[in-house]
Amino acid sequence: MSSNKIIFKNDENLNKIELDIINYSNKLIKSLNVPENTDLISGKYEGGIKIWECALDLIQFLPKIYSKSNLTNFNVLELGCGHGLPGIYFLLKKSNVTFQDFNKEVLENITNNYIIQLKDKYNLDYIKNVDFISGDWKEFKSNKKFNIIVSGDTLYNIDNYEKIFNILYNYLEKNGVAYFSTKKFYYGVGGSSSEFIYFIESKNCFEINKINEINDGISNIRLILEIKWKK
């Protein structure tokens, strides 16, 4: 569980709720029956209870692009959402957000509970258009396409790259954009940013670019990748 303080820069409403999100997650992680020190159980649990640092990178990066943008009624998808912090950012921008996670229990006990508490505490009655989808990415289905797709710390398994590509290919609007926040390497798991970039480029459908790098000289280098359809 990350102890990092969440900072939604340039959005006053988001600054009000950041501590609530952290405090709630700290309580919840103690109450749910997940083995200690377990990040992943392949095919059963994909880390949705933990707040991953790449999700924190996303929610500090997104306001730099969208703080002054009108995103009302934009369709946004967060893949592998867990706590859903990037998706919540877009909810507060009045977008229609679909939260996707492998585990239904994560969506019910964590993501949806956040949204309910935020709506009640801050009278955010405008938050209405929320969808939840659980399950493996190979079974992902939606009745809409998305203007924006975001995902944090989901590129750790090379076996998932084809599934991710298929979602982008089938559900990203032609003028849409996807942001994947990722570690440069996932030690002991197999995935890496370079492997994913090579995979996406090999499909010859999308442009993929590194648009942000976090390198503190101590921890794993982290990147934000931007994906758009080729012109």
PLM feature segments, named:
Residues 1-231:
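S-adenosylmethionine-dependent methyltransferases
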